[in-house]
Structure formats: C-alpha cells, structure tokens
C-alpha cells in the first residue's frame, strides 16, 4: 500500500512561512483525512503541536522523501471538515486579499467550530473549543403491536411522531416521559440519535404568513428577475428602489419562489440593528427553518446556528458581513440589502469585501445575486448602466405615498440670531408639534460623546490621545475623556492645560450633548439614544427598536445606525444634525457617503398613512450634494459623481489599492514605505502592460494608532491576476531587503484611500 501525504497549511504561521507543508498520514488516520480536514501537526524544530487545514491528499512520490517527513498527530471529526465549497472560498480569500491560509479559515468558520491542541495521556490531540451540547432526537421506526395492548402514553408518543422526528424536550412538553420513549426504543418502535441541541432564537416570533400582495411596479420587478432566478445559471442584478418603495416584499416573493424551487436563500444586511426587523418578516412568513449569523451572538449560539445550517436544517440565513460564508448547500438566491454600506468591507485580516465573496458564491452555486439599495455604490450603478448587471427599478413609494418634504435650516443664521444651541429653534418647535400630535421623530447625529474637542484657551493645545493622533472626546456619564480608537481614558476630566496651565474649553457636540439639550427643551418627551455607547447587552438594539416601535419613546436620537432600513409607521419628522463635518471629510467616497446617509435617513419618515417631513441643519444649505439628497435625486447625484470619478481616475475607472506600513519608529516606517514604492516601480517597469500609478508615501489620516506610526502608498491600477502577481514579486523583494527596521505591511484592495 502506497503512503499518503497531506499537504497542509499551518496555523499561526506568519506570512513568510505561510505555505503548504507535507505530512504523512499514519495508518490510524487513513480514511479520516481529506481536503478540508482540520488536523494537528508537529511543526518546527521542537515539533510543537499546531492546528492545520489540509488542502490536498496525494500519494507519496520518491521525490517527497517520505522517510524524512513527519506524521500527523490527529484529525478532527468529519463534521469539522470544510466542504469543497468552503475550501474554495478559503483559496479565494487567500489569493484576493493576501492573507494567510488560516486567517482565511478563521473567517469562513466560527470560533466554536474550531479546534485547539491539547495533551491527553501524554499524546497531542485535538479538542473542540466549545463543549458540544446535544439532545436525543426520536424517529418512528415501526408500528405498535396489538398485544400486549399499548398504554395511552405510548400511543400518544407514536401519534406525535407520525408527522416527523421530535426531540425529547419537545415530547416532554406534551407529557411524554423519557421512560416511555426509552421503552419504545427497546422494542424497536422508535430510534434515538444524538443531535446538536436546537436553539430557537426566534421562538417569540409567531409563524403568521400573510399573502404577499405586490403592487404593479413590484410585480413587474419580480417578473423581470424571475428568469435569472429559475435558469440555474449565475446571474447578478441591482434592485434600485427609492426609500419606502417596498423592496423587502420583493425580497420575500423571490425567497418564496427560491424555496419552491427546492433551493435556499441568503440575506445580508449591513448592520446588526437591521437583523431583528428582517428576521421578524422572514420568520412570520416562512417559519422556523431560519438561521442567523452575526457578531452579537455568543460563541455557543453562533456554533449552534452554524451547525443548523451545515446540517441542512435552515432554508434561509440572514446576517451581517460574515454570513456570506454560511455553509448553505444548494444556494439559489443571495440578497445584499443596502449594498452601498462600508460595513460590508472587513477592516481586519482577511480584508475582504462581501460583494466579491457574494459574487464568487453566486458563480459557484449558479445562484442569483441581488444587490439592493436606494443609493447604490457608484461602481454598482455604473456596472448596471453598462449592462454588466441586470438593472430593475422601483421608482415610486409603496401605496403612492409622496416622499418627505425637506427643508434646510441655515445654522449661520441661527447663531447670528443668538441661538447657541445645537438644536435649532425651528427643529425644537416641530419636535414639540410632533409630541402634541402623538407622532414620533428620528434625529441623526453621526457623532458619539458629549463634547468632541478640548482646547486650551491660552495656548491652543488640543487634548489628544497619547497612543493615537486624534483628539479625546468628552463623555459626560463617565465624566472622562475617551479615545474612540484605542479606548484610552483620562479621568478625572482635565480642567487645566498640561502644557501651559491655562483653562481647557470643551466644544463640539455629540449624541450625549444633544440628548441633554432635548431634555431641557422638551421636558415631557421620552428620548431614546442609540449609538455604540448606549447598548450594554447583546440584544440591546433589538430591545430599543421594539420599544420605539411600541411608542414607548417619542424621539429616537442616534448615529448612522438609525438611518437605514428601519420602518416605523408613526415617524413623521426626521432631523439631521452635524452633517457638515462628513461633507468635507477625506476620501473620494465622502460625497457618496453623505448623499446616501441623508437620503436614507430622510426616507425613514412618512412611510405609512401620515406624511413625512425632514429638516437638515447645515452651514452650507446650497451645497449641491445636500440639495440632490434633499430632492432624493439619485440620478442627478450619479451624473455628478461619475464625472468626478472619471476625471480623477477613481473607481469604477480603476482599482484603488492602499498599502499600509506600520511600525514603532516613524522614520523607519517612512523609509520602508519609500523603499517598497521604489521596488514596486522597478518591477512594474519590467511589465509595461500592467497599468499602474503609485502615489505617496504619505501619512495615513490617523498617523499614529495604538502607539504605531502609519504611512501608506496608494495605487491606481487594474486589480487582476497579473497585478496581484506583481505585488507578490514586490513583497518577496521587500522581504529580502536589509533594512535597519522593517515595518509591517498591510494591503487593502477595497479602500477609499485609507486604512
């Protein structure tokens, strides 16, 4: 019998050692190790036990020198094995994002499904990171004999199981004891098997299917998408629908058809706060074969939900970015709602864009990928206009409702009139009118904290984080200064300047300050603040939104999490505060982000029978982006934006790649960035067919973060296989350089200009 080799990628290997290593498969593991298997291997001179993933299994050749190879220590059970599809996604992440093999593996499977090395009886073995929680599942295997006459509980058990298998817990709820079940198993009438304990996160949501009644426009969109859903080939489409046009009911109808075809559906949302609303619609319409994947679940919950999907017990999965890796088989439909949101891009390794992974999955599964938004990314809309995506549109609000009426409040005039508050006189008056009418309001301020800057009145010194090159923010509940990047805290609140002893003046405003101001202006108003500081429990967002939906609160004040996808029938007034700082932000997507944010939040008003209105506070009311957003004129904005992108050579007319350099010494980081740029230019000169512009090096927007200095090179390029090969060559050449101090290198292929 020939020897078998496993080609495996090892955990905790840095990028220089991240390659496939060959190990012998010992006799006791033959038949248990396949591509995708998680294994335990000896690594390095000390043969330290390391986790690894098998990428290939091959017969050993003489050239492999099998007598010199090490053997695998252990292999995980079959259930931990990556399916061929998931393994293909690991390869995809590795090739596209330049991450390590195991960084890709950890993105694809949840923490609880991973294993760790352990020692048992002096032998290295693999242990699950979480203790498995199981329960017995009973299945009817035969008929009850007529003699001896069966008892009433035995009859009840058999009757209950005629409609399908049930767990011991479910049978206990109808009065059937474990002793009765065990007796029937001994007689061969039932079979019992261990399965992962079921976790019904949505038990409180009733299954209450209602007819999915589409408007004529919605029905037309559904009919236009239907051929792409049914022909078992990969397709991609963009559903561009104005706010309040009823995109969700089109989703439900498409999912209904997908399930009727015997296939499964994946629904992606950009924020955890949007999952409860989507889950409620899906559970009430389609029942309990529904799973969720997002970071607010604890490790046990995520594992049980993941296993439910893996075992084929979920037909629909809803979740945030990481749900794009859900192990759904026979996937027929992928919906990416609010596709323009930056949260679909990972900010840590692997730095993937869920758009790219969803496209890959659609091709692998012959599925329909549907992007949806009222304000799609410029690149997505350009692709649709160019014919690379099918374009379907909902141009009218559901039920013929008019869009909210939008007015601007010039904050320069407000200040000149003697109002120093953050809430204008008119906004306060209209909030009071809503209170008097029993209606609700939403206020958007995309800035946390109480005061956003502390400055000395004598010398102008700004209080900054000692670890990061950013101002500290005053948070009143803690009576302390906080860094929103590293968490550094200064307590008690400084009153004098550390440089000259002068007085510190705190200015700027965040959600905490506006909440306090509203309480003074509207003493009877019930105000709910929703930002990253307010939730303390994992289900806090869901609880808050449910309270607001019940009208337990009159005003919902929050950051961008209140701007998208929420649907409250009594909200008739939307206010936008502090938008100017975003309008003049850095990055080529700044205008796109502001247009999207305003359009989305304005669209939260007037979604039922009551008309909506919106007030935008700004010092630049005539700015064209604000005017276009107020008019809900996406086409007009797109024409302006695509002209700017074409002139400046920004996506979609090139790929935008940022290479970051991070280290302890600023001078060394700058030298490393300069040297990398030179090497890249030299290698690119040998390949004139690869279009490339190298900009920089330059400091990142936040030059120091967590005591590390940060510089960047910006590349305008065509991100194809040839370009990525060029980057690999340059990285190898950089690694071979004899620099006094090297910097860590980070590549981001989906950047807006910074890391």
Predicted regions: what is each one?
Residues 14, 522-525, 680-693, 737-742:
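Short secondary-structure junctions
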Residues 5, 34-35, 426, 522, ...:
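A short, contiguous, amphipathic alpha-helix enriched in charged residues
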Residues 91-94, 428, 515, 519, ...:
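Generic solvent-exposed, charged/amphipathic alpha-helical segments
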Residues 209-215, 219, 223, 232-670, ...:
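Inter-lobe coupling/hinge segments of SF2-like helicase ATPases
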Residues 678, 682-705, 709, 745-755:
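A carboxyl-terminal module marker
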Residues 1-373, 380, 385-401, 683, ...:
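Accessory, non-ATPase domains that flank or precede helicase/AAA+ motor cores in DNA-metabolism machines
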Residues 3-5, 18, 47, 438, ...:
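A general secondary-structure signal for short beta-strands and their flanking turns/coil
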């Amino acid at each position: 019998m020939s020897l078998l080799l496993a080609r495996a990628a090892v955990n905790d290997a840095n990028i220089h050692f991240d390659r496939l290593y060959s190990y012998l498969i010992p006799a006791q593991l033959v038949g248990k190790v396949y591509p995708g298997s998680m294994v335990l291997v000896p690594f390095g001179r000390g043969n330290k036990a390391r986790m690894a993933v098998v990428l290939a299994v091959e017969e050993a050749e003489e050239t492999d020198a099998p007598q010199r190879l090490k053997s695998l220590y252990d292999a995980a059970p079959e259930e931990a094995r990556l399916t061929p599809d998931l393994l293909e996604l690991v390869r995809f992440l590795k090739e596209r994002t330049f991450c390590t093999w195991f960084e890709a593996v950890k993105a694809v499977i949840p923490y609880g499904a991973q294993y760790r090395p352990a020692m048992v009886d002096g032998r290295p073995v693999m242990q699950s990171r979480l203790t498995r929680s199981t329960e017995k599942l009973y299945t009817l295997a035969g008929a009850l004999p007529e003699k001896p006459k069966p008892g009433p509980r035995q009859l009840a058990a058999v009757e209950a199981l005629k409609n399908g298998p049930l767990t011991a817990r479910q049978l206990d709820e109808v009065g059937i004891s474990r002793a009765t079940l065990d007796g029937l198993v001994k007689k061969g009438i039932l079979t019992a098997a261990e399965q992962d304990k079921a976790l019904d996160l949505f038990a409180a949501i009733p299954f209450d299917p209602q007819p999915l009644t589409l408007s004529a426009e919605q029905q037309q969109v559904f009919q236009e998408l239907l051929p792409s859903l049914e022909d078992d080939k990969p397709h991609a489409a963009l559903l561009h629908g104005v706010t309040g046009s009823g995109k969700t009911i089109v989703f439900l109808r498409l999912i209904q058809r997908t399930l009727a075809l015997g296939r499964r559906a994946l629904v992606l949302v950009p924020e955890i706060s949007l999952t409860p609303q989507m889950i409620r619609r899906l559970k009430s319409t389609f029942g309990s074969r529904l799973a969720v994947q997002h970071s607010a679940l604890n490790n046990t919950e995520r594992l049980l939900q993941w296993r439910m999907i893996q075992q084929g017990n979920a037909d629909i999965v809803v979740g945030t970015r990481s749900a794009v890796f859900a192990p759904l088989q026979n996937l027929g439909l992928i919906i990416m709602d609010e596709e323009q949101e930056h949260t679909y891009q990972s900010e840590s390794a692997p730095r993937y864009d869920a758009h790219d992974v969803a496209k890959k999955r659609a091709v692998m599964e012959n599925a329909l990928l549907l992007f949806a938004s009222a304000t799609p990314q410029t690149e997505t809309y350009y692709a649709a206009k160019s014919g690379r995506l099918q374009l379907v549109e909902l141009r009218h609000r559901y039920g013929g409702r008019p869009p909210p009426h939008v007015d601007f409040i010039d904050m320069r005039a407000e200040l000149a009139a003697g109002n120093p508050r953050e809430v204008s006189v008119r906004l306060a008056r209209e909030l009071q009118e809503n209170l008097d009418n029993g209606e609700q309001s939403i206020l958007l301020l995309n800035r946390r904290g109480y005061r956003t800057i502390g400055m000395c009145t004598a010398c102008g010194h700004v209080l900054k984080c000692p670890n990061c090159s950013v101002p500290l923010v005053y948070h009143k509940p803690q009576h302390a200064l906080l860094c929103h990047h590293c968490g550094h805290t200064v307590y008690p609140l400084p009153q004098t300047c550390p440089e000259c002893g002068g007085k510190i003046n705190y200015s700027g405003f965040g959600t905490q300050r506006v909440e306090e101001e509203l309480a003074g202006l509207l003493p009877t108003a019930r105000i709910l603040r929703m930002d990253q500081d307010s939730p303390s429990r994992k289900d806090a967002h869901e609880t808050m939104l449910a309270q607001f939906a019940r009208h337990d609160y009159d005003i919902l004040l929050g950051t961008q999490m209140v701007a998208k996808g929420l649907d409250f029938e009594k909200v008739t007034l939307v206010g936008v505060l502090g938008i100017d700082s975003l309008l003049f932000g850095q990055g080529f997507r700044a205008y796109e982000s502001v247009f999207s944010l305003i359009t989305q939040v304005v669209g939260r008003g007037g979604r039922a029978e009551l008309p909506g209105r919106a007030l935008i506070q700004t010092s630049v009311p005539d700015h064209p982006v604000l005017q276009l957003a107020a008019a809900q004129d996406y086409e007009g904005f797109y024409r302006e934006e695509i002209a700017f992108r074409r002139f400046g050579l920004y996506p979609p007319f090139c790929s935008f790649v940022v290479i970051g350099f991070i280290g302890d010494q600023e001078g060394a980081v700058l030298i490393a960035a300069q040297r990398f740029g030179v090497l890249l230019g030299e290698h690119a000169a040998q390949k004139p067919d690869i279009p490339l512009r190298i900009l920089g090096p330059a400091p990142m927007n936040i030059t120091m973060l967590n005591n590390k200095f940060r510089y960047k090179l910006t590349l305008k390029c065509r991100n194809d296989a040839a370009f990525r090969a060029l980057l690999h060559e340059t990285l190898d050449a950089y690694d071979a350089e004899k620099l006094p101090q090297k910097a860590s290198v980070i590549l981001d292929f989906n950047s807006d200009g910074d890391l």
